[in-house]
Structures are given as C-alpha cells and as structure tokens.
C-alpha cells in the first residue's frame, strides 16, 4: 500500500440479481498481510467463502459492510446504488481508511483518495477480502429473505435470474425485495 497506513480494499456483490440488495464491504488488512486462500470470491466455493469470512473479520484491522436496498437500486440505477453501498461500507469502517483500492473502473463518491483497479478482486488481497465479505453477507441475507418470501427459491439462486426464479416471478408476481426496474421482473 505505498506508504499509506490504512488503505482499504472495497468491493460489492449483487449487481446482477433481480432481487435483494447490493452489498459492499471495505477491508483494511495489516501491512504485508497474505493468506493463500483469499482471492476473488467468484473463484471460491460457497464453503470456502464461509470458511474465510471469520478469518478475514478476525485478521482485519477494520472492516465495514453496508448495502443499498432494492428500492435504492430502482431509484438510482444499479451502478449508482453499487457506488452508494461501497461509500457506506467505507463510512462503516471503525478505523478511517486513508486510501481506497476500488474494484472496477468507477470511483466512489467520497473524499478519501482512491484508485480503481480493474479485476482488483484477483490482484489486490484487500479487495479480494472485501469481495468475500460482501458475497457471504449478501448470500446470508438471501437465505433469510427466502424464509420471509418463500416460493422464489432465493436461498438457492440468491436472486440471480435463473429459469426457476423467472418462472416463480411469473407465477407469484414480484416480492417486496424484487428490483422493479430489472428486465424479467414482471410487475
């Protein structure tokens, strides 16, 4: 982290789903931190991510997890809602970050100096750690939502547009956590 004492990696999960929030995480790791298992959450199994979650939260100097609601996704658009969730995750850090490494190519709207890293979840350990916290947190929320809104199979597909999910929306109509502005969500 080039001389910064508290750089945070920031990433989000849940841009593509038709239902549920966008969840973001910001993680500050100790200087020189390395863990062979921590890499892009999309390359890890559900079980590997669940196993790494408590390792990351224990080892991190600080972490923040936050979300943008399905209503905010509809009101703002998915990109702006993702950036909002990431800003909230940075604001949730108990130790303020002095620099941000953001996965992707869009800066987040806040005053902390930052650098965007395309493919960052595969190139920067703090972004990879953030991707795991965001994905695990979101997956756990979707399992809870499946209990509240049964019939859509949310705990299986996590809100992504599977055939089963699209058929359930056609059959049941959208739930309160469905993103009304997304194609496939028939109101």
Each language-model region and where it sits:
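RNase H-like, Mg2+-dependent phosphodiesterase core
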Residues: 1-187
């Amino acid at each position: 982290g080039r001389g910064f004492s508290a750089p945070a990696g920031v990433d989000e999960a849940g841009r593509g789903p038709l239902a549920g929030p966008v969840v973001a995480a910001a993680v500050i790791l100790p200087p020189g931190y390395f863990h062979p298992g921590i890499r892009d959450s999309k390359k890890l199994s559900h079980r590997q991510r669940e196993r790494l979650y408590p390792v990351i939260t224990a080892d991190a100097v600080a972490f923040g997890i936050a979300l943008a609601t399905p209503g905010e996704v509809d009101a703002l658009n998915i990109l702006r809602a993702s950036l909002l969730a990431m800003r909230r995750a940075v604001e949730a850090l108990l130790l303020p970050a002095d620099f941000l490494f953001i996965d992707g190519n869009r800066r987040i709207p806040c005053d902390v100096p930052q650098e965007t890293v395309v493919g960052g979840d595969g190139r920067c350990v703090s972004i990879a750690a953030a991707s795991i916290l965001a994905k695990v947190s979101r997956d756990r929320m979707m399992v809870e939502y499946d209990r509240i809104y049964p019939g859509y199979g949310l705990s299986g597909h996590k809100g992504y547009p599977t055939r089963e999910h699209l058929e359930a929306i056609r059959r049941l109509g959208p739930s309160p956590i469905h993103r009304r502005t997304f194609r496939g969500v028939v109101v």
